[in-house]
Every structure is written in structure tokens, then in C-alpha cells.
């Protein structure tokens, strides 16, 4: 604490990211990174960049990357916004589109950066409780609001909504911005991007994705939003009032290659999905209660062991998972899906513990 802090700093409770262990021998299953490397085309695209050009600023608009994303998703270039990871995109969304007189709505158990942004930007927020099975109950969002945001699938639960249900939410909230955070969409969830295609694109819907998960580029920091050009214009205004150059040359080159290599995306996503099912089956046999997941993680608890006990015991064995010391979910662990070998090591440890 310092006397030089501004008043807002005293009120902040910052987001706490998952641990990044310094010990290399640890099995890291806590931050939902891909267990596989990025596409070889990504590495080649980065290597082909002229390092002499690193003295020059990158394209502030990221036009070529926007073109690649637009072509891949069937959208127009002016429907794409780029950011330094989806967290930066979300920050601009909260400031540019969700700060209104009425409160923004989001689930009570969800991505914990949402309330942090609300506090930082002075945005009113109202959490909406998940159902008894940790499902998002869209009927509970039928109330006056200054915007609605939720991940699909939700995090940390992994539960997803069908795009048809979300389309109904959009129709009943024509005067609010609806933000669908699709960080984990490629592991079995139906994307809402088709709702944005063509002349019928709703004026109030934004879909956010990232290259950090299924495209295995968490270290490159690239995220993007897709939506109506008027929403994108608002985000560009915020970005250019904050940082006109969010993506470096190497990031833009690597991201273009990652977006274009759909075959690699589908291949490694399929591997994660298969390994996820193996883990769920093993957890069931050990007596765990696991929430149905369409993400690259599972959310699970054991009726005879507390969450913190399991977390600490696994940590002592060199396996790091995520534990949230929060109401309703304190006994749950969020476990990232690793390789088949990592999965086997985790299952063996749990068998010995249980």
C-alpha cells in the first residue's frame, strides 16, 4: 500500500490467474492450456518473419489477420476486432459496451475476471445464480439489464448452452448487448458465430474467441471479437484510446497461420475430447461426481474428500490442478485435460489417494 495510490486501486480485488509453477517436474493441469504444441504452420510463419522489421511498428489494424478470421468464419472484415488475448478484448467490451445505468448480468459462478472488470471500470453488476446442476438458466436473465455476458461453455463448470437457446435470449433482449465468451468452444460446443453471418447479423451480439486454448497459443496472446460493425467500431474506439498496437508482428503472423490451419485445430481438439472421456470414465469409477463438460477441462468432486484436501494431496505428488475456495464449489476441482500419458499419471495418483 502507498499514499500515492489512486482511490480506485484501494477498492480493487485483482484477478488471480492459475499458478505457473517454476518447477519443471510438476504435472501442470491447472490453467487449461493445450497439451499439444501449435500447428507446425504457425512455427513456420513466425520463423519466416523478417527480424529486421521488428524495429517497425506492426499494422495497428491487423488487417490481414482480420481478413483470415473473416474468411474462416464467414464474416466481413469490419465484423472483426483484435486484442492482446481475449482478456484484453473483454476489458474493452466492458468499458465500451457494458457500462450503462442498469447492471450487467452474468452467472454467479463463472469467469472471475468479469467482476474484476466491473470494479475497475465502475460498472454495476448483478450475478445470476446457476441452477442446482450448475446450468445457466436463461429465463433468469429476463429482467432489465445493461448487458449480459457469459462463457459458453461456462467456466469453471464446462456446461454449455445450445445456440438455439442463446438465439432466444437475444430475441428477448433486443435493447441489451449480449456477449458470448467462446474461449472453449472448439471442444464440443455449438458456436454462435453463425448467428452473425449475413445481412441478418443482430446489432447487439458479440462473440469472443481466443487462440490460447484449442489453437495452443497461450504464449502468443491473441484474442478476437466478432459482431455487428457498430459494436466493433466501439471496441476500436476504446482500443485506440488505450493501445493502438496490441498485436506484434510475430503474433499476427502466427495467428494468421493458426486460424488458417483448420485441420490441425480439429485434430488436436478431437484428441482432447477423447482423453476427456477417458478421464470422466475413470473419475466415475473412483466415485467422483463430474459435471458434464464440453471444454478442455472437467469440474469434479468426491463425496468423501474435500476439494482442498484433494488439491493439496495432488500438489504434494507433483500434480497441479485448480481449486476455487468459493461458496458452492469449494469441494470441486477443475482439471485440465492433458495428454494420454498425463491423464494416466493423474488417474494413477487419484486411485492411490482415494
Which residues are covered by each model-predicted region?
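Active-site pre-lysine segment of PLP-dependent enzymes
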Residues: 119, 135-144, 156-178, 182-217, ...
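Phosphate-binding glycine-rich loop
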Residues: 63-103
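N-terminal "arm"/small-domain region of PLP-dependent enzymes with the aminotransferase-like
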Residues: 1-56, 144
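PLP-dependent aminotransferase class I/II
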Residues: 204-284, 288-291
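PLP-dependent enzyme catalytic core of the Aspartate aminotransferase-like
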Residues: 313-317, 322, 326-354
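PLP-dependent aminotransferase-like
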Residues: 96-151
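Conserved PLP-binding catalytic core of the aspartate aminotransferase-like
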Residues: 272-273, 285-317, 333
Amino acid at each position: 500500500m502507498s499514499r500515492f495510490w489512486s482511490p480506485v486501486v484501494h477498492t480493487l480485488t485483482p484477478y488471480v490467474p492459475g499458478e505457473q509453477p517454476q518447477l519443471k517436474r510438476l504435472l501442470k493441469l491447472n490453467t487449461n492450456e493445450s497439451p499439444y504444441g501449435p500447428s507446425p504452420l504457425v512455427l513456420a510463419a513466425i520463423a519466416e518473419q523478417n527480424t529486421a522489421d521488428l524495429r517497425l511498428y506492426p499494422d495497428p489494424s491487423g488487417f490481414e489477420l482480420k481478413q483470415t478470421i473473416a474468411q474462416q468464419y464467414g464474416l466481413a472484415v469490419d465484423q472483426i476486432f483484435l486484442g492482446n488475448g481475449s482478456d484484453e478484448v473483454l476489458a474493452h467490451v466492458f468499458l465500451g459496451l457494458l457500462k450503462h445505468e442498469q447492471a450487467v448480468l452474468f452467472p454467479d459462478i463463472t469467469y472471475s475476471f468479469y467482476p474484476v472488470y466491473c470494479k475497475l471500470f465502475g460498472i454495476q453488476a448483478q450475478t445470476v445464480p446457476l441452477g442446482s446442476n450448475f446450468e445457466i438458466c436463461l429465463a433468469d436473465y429476463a429482467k432489465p439489464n445493461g448487458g449480459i455476458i457469459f462463457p459458453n461453455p461456462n467456466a469453471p463448470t464446462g456446461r454449455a448452452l445450445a445456440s438455439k437457446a442463446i438465439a432466444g435470449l437475444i430475441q428477448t433482449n433486443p435493447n441489451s448487448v449480449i456477449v458470448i465468451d467462446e474461449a472453449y468452444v472448439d471442444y464440443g460446443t455449438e458456436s454462435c458465430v453463425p448467428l452473425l453471418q449475413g445481412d441478418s447479423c443482430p446489432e447487439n451480439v458479440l462473440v469472443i474467441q481466443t487462440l490460447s486454448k484449442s489453437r495452443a497459443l497461450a504464449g502468443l496472446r491473441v484474442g478476437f471479437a466478432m459482431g455487428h460493425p457498430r459494436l466493433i467500431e466501439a471496441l476500436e474506439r476504446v482500443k485506440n484510446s488505450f493501445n493502438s498496437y496490441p498485436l506484434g508482428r510475430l503474433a499476427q503472423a502466427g495467428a494468421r497461420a493458426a486460424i488458417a490451419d483448420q485441420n490441425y485445430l480439429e485434430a488436436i481438439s478431437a484428441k482432447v475430447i477423447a482423453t476427456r472421456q477417458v478421464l470422466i470414465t475413470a473419475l466415475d469409477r473412483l466415485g467422483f461426481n463430474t459435471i458434464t463438460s464440453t471444454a478442455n477441462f472437467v469440474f469434479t468432486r468426491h463425496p468423501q474428500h474435500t476439494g482442498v484436501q484433494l488439491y493439496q494431496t495432488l500438489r504434494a505428488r507433483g500434480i497441479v490442478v485448480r481449486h476455487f475456495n468459493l461458496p458452492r464449489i469449494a469441494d470441486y476441482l477443475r482439471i485440465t485435460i492433458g495428454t494420454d500419458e498425463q491423464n494416466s499419471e493423474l488417474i494413477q495418483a487419484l486411485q492411490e489417494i482415494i
